[in-house]
Design a protein with these regions (language model features):
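Short, flexible turn/loop "capping" segments at secondary-structure junctions
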Residues: 16, 62-64, 103-106
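Short, flexible loop/turn segments with low-complexity composition
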Residues: 38, 61, 137-139
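PLP-dependent enzyme catalytic core of the Aspartate aminotransferase-like
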Residues: 80-139
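Structural signature of PLP-dependent enzymes
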Residues: 1-48
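Short alpha-helical functional segments enriched in proximate histidine and acidic residues
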Residues: 26, 49, 53, 132
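Generic structural "secondary-structure junction" signal
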Residues: 9-11, 60, 118
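Conserved PLP-binding catalytic core of the aspartate aminotransferase-like
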Residues: 32, 40-44, 53-94, 98
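Short amphipathic alpha-helical segments
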Residues: 3-5, 66-70, 107-111
Length: 139
């Protein structure tokens, strides 16, 4: 469109704004320090569980250096959202088949944690990774 109309935003997302307001209120009620502590605990639990299976966790042993992300694999493999590593691809498919939300970034499996994740979620991911490893070893 010629002219200033090309900058029109269209309809405003009032429902999204109301939902965002309530979400921010909830996060503020929980408190950022509590969220950080919860996510940090989950991150350490996940990283330690995967490391115990000798999976290549980026960043190594858990500690304060970890963020809310746990990545598995070797950095630099393939494109932005793919991997050339057959093992990582196989584990990713196993997680997909069991409805674990994750992504592939630069050859790594990327697991992102937040306040809505639980210790049970982490235990399930670790159990699925162990199941994948044991199935692969038996083949």
């Amino acid at each position: 469109m010629p002219g200033a109309r090309r900058f029109d935003l269209g309809n405003h997302n009032y429902i999204g704004a109301a939902a965002a307001e309530k979400s921010i209120e909830l996060l503020n009620a929980i408190g950022t320090k509590n969220i950080e502590r919860h996510v940090g605990d989950l991150t350490r639990q996940l990283a330690d569980g995967l490391l115990a299976m000798d999976l290549p966790v980026v960043g190594g042993s858990s500690g304060d250096h970890l963020t809310s992300l746990v990545c598995v694999g070797k950095l630099g493999g393939s494109g932005h959202d793919s991997t050339d590593d057959a093992e990582i691809s196989s584990l990713s498919h196993h997680l997909d088949n069991n409805k674990v939300q994750h992504s592939i970034r630069k050859g790594l499996i990327r697991l992102s944690l937040h306040i809505y994740n639980t210790r049970e979620d982490i235990a399930e991911v670790i159990a699925l990774a162990r199941e994948w490893r044991d199935t692969k070893a038996a083949a």
